[in-house]
């Protein structure tokens, strides 16, 4: 049905060949260009990506009467949202008294005071509405004995602004919450007139005078180029975990959205903040949900000690993810790891009733058996901190509008362009995301994009014309890759990049190692000129698509490591051995009376603004202030910074 919808639409649009000047592509012959058939489309809104954020945005747009296209490089229910396990946060108060303001406080604290408090206010206030909406769509939440939505404990979450003990705030569907959410949203979207372009790869944004007027994409099935002109474009492409060697991300998580903006001359933000999930299966990287610790599991070292009691005496194994990952790494570095090489940690669940494991954690029980050969009712799971989430991305405001920042003009909205989900930086996660806030981010900001677009767009009105020769650079790049006579395979260069990022920008970072990593990544970026795409065809050319994804990954990787090398402090997921302290505008570990507030240039409680020269790979940096004001002071006031402990 979905394929027929796009094919039916294709019959109504114009097709032509693209002509390029010789200067726009490498040594490709002019006759080669005629191979590229170009198809044009016109929509009120185009969504790139069909995970949770993309589907929620598309549903809202189509429900509001806008002609909406969804471009996705894989079938919607294979999007990486499907892999989220633990749950979605909302202060429903089903297990204990709760308040969205407590959720707001925990999220600000979890961000290590790098989160924008207006966006955090919006997300946490709207969380209950979002979960009830999902329930009304048919999402089969786990239930309590009295029929309410079951809520489990998750890391970094408290009652009464940190004074009331552990909160139970995470709504879940056993340990398959993302799977359920994705299928629920996709099923619900089919009742609206969304036009799906499945297995289409987004190549570039179409920009004219600073305005986004559409997207260029390639149909994987036959290699045709499609130009989507639209008044509104929503990026919902996920993260770039595959820039690292060990990660929980699917092979499709290649930072396509952040690369699209970088190529369009739009800045990204806070790319140095990469979350390492404490419990990826050792040797495999597969995720073991934080919900396993929320259900009563705990971490032990080689002495059988519950070591988190030393690092986080109150929260213990449910401290925030950055704290737990660093604590595990310290245990390993100091010789208290487990296994023959003492290079990992055990997650113990076998003290829990088998019935509880079967009911609440069936997915990870199966995963542990398949990937670690472990029966969780009898043995501990070998785990190690693993790259899991990117806090940085395309900067937006709480409405989802993409922002371009300059020191002279401050934040300026990029007309026609929105971002939601992991590819966006709203910034609700700041320097560290709380577990189960990611699924919330998806539905809250996917919906926010749709709301703002509907306020400013009437169906069929104002769809822009395409700039002359739109898409020439995209076709030139493809043609160059197909005909390049290099001697480096895509897989070889990708693996070198992944290992370099793992070695130079891991849980603990140091200036000299980061500096070396910057040099290595700079060389790897230039090595793209020597890539060899073995498959020269256009039909289902996976070699070509993986090379395009590698181009995207290298943009993300270089931005990440340069921003990390430049940030000389430790905050959230960014931990520097040589700069172990957080450097704020005031020293919040001491009485504030008598202190002088530092200027923005003299402290690090600020967002990094990152731009790339796509030709050379050179990265430039600016910084903008964190937003400390809430949307409405009468609803909740801001949370002032303080020393962060659990």
Curated annotation (Swiss-Prot):
Pathway: Carbohydrate metabolism; tricarboxylic acid cycle; fumarate from succinate (eukaryal route): step 1/1. It is a peripheral membrane protein. The active site is at 321 (proton acceptor). GO terms for cellular component: mitochondrial inner membrane; mitochondrion; respiratory chain complex II (succinate dehydrogenase). The keyword Oxidoreductase applies. GO terms for biological process: mitochondrial electron transport, succinate to ubiquinone; tricarboxylic acid cycle. Keywords: Electron transport, FAD, Flavoprotein, Membrane, Mitochondrion, Mitochondrion inner membrane, Oxidoreductase, Transit peptide, Transport, Tricarboxylic acid cycle. Residues 1-31 form a transit peptide. Its EC number is 1.3.5.1. Its main location: mitochondrion. InterPro entries: FAD-dep_OxRdtase_2_FAD-bd, FAD/NAD-bd_sf, FRD_SDH_FAD_BS, Fum_R/Succ_DH_flav-like_C_sf, Fum_Rdtase/Succ_DH_flav-like_C, SdhA/FrdA/AprA, Succ_DH/fumarate_Rdtase_cat_sf, Succ_DH_flav_su_fwd. Disulfide bonds: none annotated. It is found in: Mitochondrion inner membrane. It catalyses: a quinone + succinate = fumarate + a quinol. SUPFAM superfamilies: FAD/NAD(P)-binding domain, Succinate dehydrogenase/fumarate reductase flavoprotein C-terminal domain, Succinate dehydrogenase/fumarate reductase flavoprotein, catalytic domain. FAD binds at residues 49-54, 72-87, 256, 422, 438-439. Component of complex II composed of four subunits: a flavoprotein (FP), an iron-sulfur protein (IP), and a cytochrome b composed of a large and a small subunit. Belongs to the FAD-dependent oxidoreductase 2 family. FRD/SDH subfamily. Flavoprotein (FP) subunit of succinate dehydrogenase (SDH) that is involved in complex II of the mitochondrial electron transport chain and is responsible for transferring electrons from succinate to ubiquinone (coenzyme Q). This is Succinate dehydrogenase [ubiquinone] flavoprotein subunit, mitochondrial. It comes from Caenorhabditis elegans. The gene is sdha-1.
């Amino acid at each position: 049905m979905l394929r027929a919808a796009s094919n039916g639409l294709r019959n109504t649009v114009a097709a032509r060949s693209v002509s390029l000047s010789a200067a726009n592509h490498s040594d490709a012959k002019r006759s080669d260009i005629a191979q590229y058939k170009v198809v044009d489309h016109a929509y009120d809104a185009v969504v790139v990506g069909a995970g949770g954020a993309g589907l929620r945005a598309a549903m809202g747009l189509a429900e509001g009467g806008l002609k909406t296209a969804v471009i996705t490089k894989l079938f919607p229910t294979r999007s990486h949202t499907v892999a989220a396990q633990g749950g979605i946060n909302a202060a429903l108060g089903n297990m204990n008294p709760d308040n969205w303001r407590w959720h707001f406080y925990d999220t600000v604290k979890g961000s290590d005071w790098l989160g924008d408090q207006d966006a955090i206010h919006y997300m946490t206030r709207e969380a209950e509405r979002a979960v009830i909406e999902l329930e009304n769509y048919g999402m089969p939440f786990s239930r309590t004995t009295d029929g309410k939505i079951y809520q489990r404990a998750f890391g970094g979450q408290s009652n009464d602004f940190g004074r009331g003990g552990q909160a139970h705030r995470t709504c879940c569907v056993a340990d398959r919450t993302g799977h359920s959410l994705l299928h629920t949203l996709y099923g619900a979207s089919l009742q609206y007139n969304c036009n799906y372009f499945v297995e289409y790869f987004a190549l570039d944004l179409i920009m004219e005078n600073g305005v986004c007027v559409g997207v260029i994409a390639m149909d994987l099935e036959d290699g045709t180029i499609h130009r989507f002109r639209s008044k509104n474009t929503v990026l919902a492409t996920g993260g770039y975990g595959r820039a690292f060697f060990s990660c929980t991300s699917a092979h499709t998580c290649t930072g396509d959205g952040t690369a699209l903006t970088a190529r369009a001359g739009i800045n990204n933000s806070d790319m140095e903040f990469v979350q390492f999930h404490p419990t990826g299966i050792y040797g495999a990287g597969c995720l073991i949900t934080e919900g396993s610790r929320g259900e009563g599991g705990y971490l032990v070292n080689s002495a059988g000690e519950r070591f988190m009691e030393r690092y986080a005496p109150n929260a213990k194994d449910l401290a925030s993810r950055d704290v737990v990952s660093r604590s595990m790494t310290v245990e390993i570095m100091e010789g208290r790891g487990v296994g023959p090489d003492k290079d990992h940690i055990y997650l113990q669940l076998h003290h829990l009733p088998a019935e509880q494991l079967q009911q609440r954690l069936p997915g990870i029980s199966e995963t542990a058996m398949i990937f670690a050969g472990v029966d969780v009712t009898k043995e501990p799971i070998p785990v190690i901190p693993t790259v899991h989430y990117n806090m940085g991305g395309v900067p937006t405001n709480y409405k989802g509008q993409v922002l371009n920042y300059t020191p002279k003009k401050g934040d300026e909205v990029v007309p026609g362009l929105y971002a939601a989900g992991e590819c966006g930086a709203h910034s609700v996660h700041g320097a560290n995301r709380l577990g189960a806030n990611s699924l919330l981010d998806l539905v809250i900001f996917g919906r926010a994009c749709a709301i703002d677009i509907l306020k400013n767009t009437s169906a069929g009105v104002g769809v822009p014309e395409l700039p002359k020769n739109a898409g020439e650079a995209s076709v030139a790049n493809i043609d160059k890759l197909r005909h390049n006579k290099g001697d480096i395979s895509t897989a070889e260069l990708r693996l070198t990049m992944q290992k370099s990022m793992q070695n130079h920008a891991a849980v603990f970072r140091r200036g000299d190692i980061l500096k070396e990593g910057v040099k290595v990544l700079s060389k790897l970026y230039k090595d793209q000129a020597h890539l060899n795409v073995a498959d020269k065809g256009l039909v289902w050319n996976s070699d070509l698509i993986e090379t395009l994804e590698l181009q995207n990954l290298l943009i993300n990787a270089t931005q990440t490591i340069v921003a990390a090398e430049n940030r000389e402090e430790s905050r959230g997921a960014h931990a520097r051995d040589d700069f172990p302290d957080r450097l704020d505008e005031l020293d919040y570990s001491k009485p504030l009376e008598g202190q002088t507030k530092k200027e923005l240039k003299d402290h690090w409680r600020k967002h990094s603004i990152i731009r790339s020269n796509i030709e050379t790979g050179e990265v430039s940096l600016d910084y903008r202030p964190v937003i400390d004001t809430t949307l409405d002071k009468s609803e909740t006031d801001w949370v002032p910074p303080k020393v962060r402990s659990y």
